[in-house]
Amino acid sequence: MADNMTTTQIEVGPGATNATINFEAGILECYERLSWQRALDYPGQDRLNRLKRKLESRIKTHNKSEPESKRMSLEERKAIGVKMMKVLLFMNPSAGIEGFEPYCMKNSSNSNCPNCNWTDYPPTSGKCLDDIEEEPENVDDPTEIVLRDMNNKDARQKIKEEVNTQKEGKFRLTIKRDIRNVLSLRVLVNGTFLKHPNGYKSLSTLHRLNAYDQSGRLVAKLVATDDLTVEDEEDGHRILNSLFERFNEGHSKPIRAAETAVGVLSQFGQEHRLSPEEGDN
């Protein structure tokens, strides 16, 4: 985020999770209305369907933790989300809803709101996408796999073996692909595994994925947002398998980190996080 940009702090009342789900439901409503107008292209339609599936899954999970009186359907959350957008876009207190009011400072001189002066605050301290450290956050006993002079099949098998030893909880996985002393792929993955009673393991959340090109330059950084959170077990395996398969395609040329980054990004509709030059690599 540029230094001269500002953000408006928002108080979300009953909890950030509820506010986020409701807001994304409002976004879904906008997507659907655009689709009804036949103004949504094919990638947009894919994003609409993906967002709807993720929201339905997340709402189902979230409602289980809420008292029955507070559980809401997707349609109810859509209505609240649209109202939230009015607050955010127009900063209009009359559009506000209970538990969600824009942050303001008391100032009776403002004509739009007798008691408030709408103010933009400098960004809060913390890391934005472009400022994230290259190494994932600290994790106990991180796993590092160095693949030297291995063919693709052996490399894939070694990664699988290492991943299968992960215990429940957060993990960090560093993959270094080294063929004839040429670093052709380096991927850092940070996520959370779940271990099930039957011994089955699943990747519940992908917190971060960094991909580097052959020169060691960072090609792509993924951080945890809702659409980068794996909502079901099979998605977790699909994401990791997409990485493994990069080692097993049998290409004569070294596998590039950019290829892996594009492959993973595309699963989330996040290709725009790569520059055109990186996307062409």
From Swiss-Prot:
Keyword RNA-binding found: yes
Cystine pairs: none
A GO-annotated cellular component: host cell nucleus
InterPro entries in alphabetical order: NS1 (IPR004208), uS15_NS1_RNA-bd_sf (IPR009068)
Protein purpose: Binds and inhibits the conjugation of the ubiquitin-like G1P2/ISG15 protein to its target proteins. Since G1P2/ISG15 is an early antiviral protein, NS1 may inhibit the host antiviral response. Prevents EIF2AK2/PKR activation, either by binding double strand RNA or by interacting directly with EIF2AK2/PKR. Also binds poly(A) and U6 snRNA.
Record's comment describing the protein's domains: Both N-terminus and C-terminus can inhibit IFN-beta promoter activation and IRF-3 nuclear translocation.
Similarity annotation: Belongs to the influenza B viruses NS1 family.
Name this protein carries in UniProt: Non-structural protein 1
Organism of derivation: Influenza B virus (strain B/Yamagata/1/1973)
Taxon lineage: Viruses, Riboviria, Orthornavirae, Negarnaviricota, Polyploviricotina
